[in-house]
């Protein structure tokens, strides 16, 4: 479904991604793990057009999307849940979800279909329905994360990009969100690319994983193998979180 070929992305003179290549199959959950500053968020932003690639190619369903603007990439079927949630705090839950479907309204899609999709979001996250008229800024962090995911789903994506969805949340809330991600894959066929600080939880959820260091992919493989990899264990899964990739 998604393929990155030799992607190089820059922030000014800073070479953030260095010849990154990866792929996701239809219906897969794939996770990116690595230390802070490794380039995980930059990969998501490059895919979604927020930080365009300097060179290389992004293919979605075999179509090049590298040079497209973010709104066109959303229309193609890619939605991103940003780090830090970034909900519209002065607006209600329902208004936030409506904004997630903004491009669908602009294309004059049947409003009944959009309302049906909102009902499906409420089925995934019942607390959002209970608080549909509540201002987003008055909600807990976990509820805001649910809202951010629901807002992304309102664009009706085939590929969902998630950036650190567990950040700052209680373990029970994280478990609930991860159950929803698995349900989206199982029941709706949504493909998921997950950036996650909780490497162990992410690898248990995902089919495959990539390990990044300083803008390069240094390891990849099935999640079960990465969970048993000695270096991954030492760097991300055990008590000793010290960076070990430096040689």
Positions of PLM-derived features:
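Helix-to-loop junction immediately C-terminal to a conserved catalytic motif
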Residues: 48
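Conserved ABC transporter NBD signature motif
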Residues: 56-64, 76, 109, 113-118
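Conserved catalytic motifs of ABC-family nucleotide-binding domains
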Residues: 156
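The feature captures the beta-strand-to-loop junction immediately N-terminal to the Walker
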Residues: 33-35
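ABC-type ATPase nucleotide-binding domains, specifically the catalytic core motifs of the NBD
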Residues: 12, 30, 68, 93-116, ...
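ABC ATPase C-loop
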Residues: 152-153
């Amino acid at each position: 479904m998604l393929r990155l070929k030799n992607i190089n992305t820059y922030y000014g003179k800073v070479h953030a991604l260095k010849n990154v290549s990866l792929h996701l199959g239809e219906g897969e959950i794939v996770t990116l793990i690595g230390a802070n500053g490794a380039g995980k968020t930059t990969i998501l932003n490059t895919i979604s057009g927020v930080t365009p690639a300097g060179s290389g190619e992004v293919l979605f369903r075999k179509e090049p999307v590298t040079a497209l603007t973010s709104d066109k990439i959303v229309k193609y079927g890619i939605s991103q849940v940003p780090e830090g949630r970034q909900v519209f705090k002065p607006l209600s839950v329902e208004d936030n979800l409506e904004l997630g479907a903004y491009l669908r309204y602009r294309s004059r899609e049947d409003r009944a279909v959009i309302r049906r999709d909102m009902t499906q979001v409420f089925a995934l996250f019942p607390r959002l329905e209970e608080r549909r008229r509540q201002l987003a800024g008055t909600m807990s962090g976990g509820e805001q994360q649910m809202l951010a995911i629901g807002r992304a789903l309102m664009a009706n994506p085939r590929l969902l990009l998630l950036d650190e969805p567990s950040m700052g949340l209680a373990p029970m809330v994280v478990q609930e969100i991860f159950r929803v991600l698995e349900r989206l894959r199982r029941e709706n066929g949504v493909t998921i690319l997950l950036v996650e600080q909780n490497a162990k939880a992410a690898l248990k959820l995902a089919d495959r994983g990539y390990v990044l260091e300083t803008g390069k992919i240094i390891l990849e493989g099935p999640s079960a193998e990465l969970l048993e990899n000695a270096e991954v264990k030492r760097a991300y899964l055990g008590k000793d979180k010290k960076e070990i990739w430096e040689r």
